[in-house]
């Protein structure tokens, strides 16, 4: 399973981004493929928050469109909603201890912990995922 980070979701809908085409191509292909695509609430909520933010994109999505997009992704046959297990708090603490910080890496550490719990990899443009011990991650162009 591959768990999708918010930046891939945002690039997939932002047609002005240089990462739009590889992100959309990977996401569409993954959602129509046989392998599971993991979605977690933190990246999904970040997508809704940022995709609808005036001034961030040339044409922010209307709230309804962003919510519908999330629903469409989750309705795909290969989509799986990934939730923390009972081991999550311990794994999350280990991830934060390993990188020696919290702050801006807390959400990344949460996603990294989910990946470890579910034996998944992360798809993201954020190289910070390379800092977490035992976490596999790829950028969409490398997966095409």
Swiss-Prot record:
CC cofactor: Mg(2+)
Record localization: Secreted
Protein name as catalogued: Ribonuclease VapC37
Main location per the UniProt record: secreted
Organism taxonomic ancestry: Bacteria, Bacillati, Actinomycetota, Actinomycetes, Mycobacteriales
GO biological process, one term: negative regulation of growth
InterPro entries given in the database record: Mtu_PIN, PIN-like_dom_sf, PIN_dom, VapC_family
Residues where Mg(2+) binds: 5, 90
Keyword Metal-binding: yes
GO cellular component, one term: extracellular region
CDD domains in the record: PIN_MtVapC25_VapC33-like (cd18678)
UniProt gene name: vapC37
Highest taxon of the lineage: Bacteria
């Amino acid at each position: 399973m591959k768990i999708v980070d918010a930046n891939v979701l945002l690039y997939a809908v932002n047609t002005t981004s240089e990462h739009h085409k590889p992100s959309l191509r990977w996401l569409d292909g993954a959602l129509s493929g046989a392998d599971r695509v993991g979605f977690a609430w933190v990246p999904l909520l970040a997508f809704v928050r940022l995709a609808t933010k005036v001034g961030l994109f040339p044409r922010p999505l209307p709230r309804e469109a962003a919510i519908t997009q999330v629903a469409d992704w989750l309705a795909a046959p290969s989509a799986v909603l990934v939730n923390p297990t009972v081991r999550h708090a311990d794994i999350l603490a280990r991830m934060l201890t390993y990188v020696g910080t919290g702050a801006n890496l807390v959400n990344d550490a949460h996603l990294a912990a989910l990946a470890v719990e579910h034996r998944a990899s992360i798809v993201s443009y954020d190289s910070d995922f390379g800092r977490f011990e035992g976490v596999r991650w790829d950028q969409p162009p490398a997966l095409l």
